[in-house]
Amino acid sequence: MPYIDLNADLGEGFGIWQLGDDDAMLGIVTSANVACGFHAGEPAGLLRVCRAAAERGVRIGAQVGYRDLAGFGRRFIDVDPEDLVAEVVYQIGALQAIAQSCGSTVSYVKPHGALYNTIVTHRDQAAAVAEAVRMVDATLPVLGMTGSVFFQQATDLGLRTVAEAFADRAYRSDGQLVSRREHGAVLADAAAIAQRAVSMVASGKVTAVDGTQVPITMESICVHGDSPGAMQIATAVRDRLTAAGNEIRAFC
């Protein structure tokens, strides 16, 4: 039976400001991309998420980002590569301590937001993120976009790369994501998103906004926990994938 992992961004609240229903999403996904305090998240909240993930057997991933709480890590920052190495090392280390205190561990690393999109093509920042992961633990897989410069740099350093697809994001014809600033970048119809996920897994292709069929490889599918109707979307995606004969399990 083919398998696919489901991942979602969690732990992105800050104090009394909560974003999404982390507990509910942990009942659906198999991998949790947990914020590390730079783009979102605060220690007590991250501890709660990691504890809940550990109790449910959900893998914990360090979701590293730019130091940009005000912009939620969705703004490009022209950070010096050496500084970026240090900041990514810091974030992984912080979440690793929290995860270990809950009887779990950081199992992989996934960049967040603008950093994720930037290192698809930005060689210096891609190399910095890959080097930071290698410095912390060269056995940690990195989750990202197939064909990216980041994956090239990670492979050169001997890191395992795990390709993901986005069930609820629109794609350009070059295989990159449509910017969130553009209309239609984030999809909202749960049934259509679920069918799209099944089609991507079965065909290895995704339909871009211009109608182009873009080849895509994936071991994991991302469902966003902060979108309107996130729970309905994630549930529909999991149910449709399972009904189509796919086993839902973590990639690591």
UniProtKB/Swiss-Prot annotation:
Family matches, as InterPro entries: Glyco_hydro/deAcase_b/a-brl, LamB/YcsF/PxpA-like
Record text on subunit structure and interactions: Forms a complex composed of PxpA, PxpB and PxpC.
Name this protein carries in UniProt: 5-oxoprolinase subunit A
Family note: Belongs to the LamB/PxpA family.
Biological processes annotated in GO: carbohydrate metabolic process
Its EC number(s): 3.5.2.9
Reactions mediated catalytically: 5-oxo-L-proline + ATP + 2 H2O = L-glutamate + ADP + phosphate + H(+)
Function summary: Catalyzes the cleavage of 5-oxoproline to form L-glutamate coupled to the hydrolysis of ATP to ADP and inorganic phosphate.
Any GO molecular function: ATP binding
Cross-referenced Pfam families: LamB_YcsF
Keywords (A to Z) from UniProt: ATP-binding, Hydrolase, Nucleotide-binding
Root EC class: hydrolase
Source species of the chain: Mycobacterium ulcerans (strain Agy99)
NCBIfam families (alphabetical): PRK05406.1-3 (NF003814), PRK05406.1-5 (NF003816)
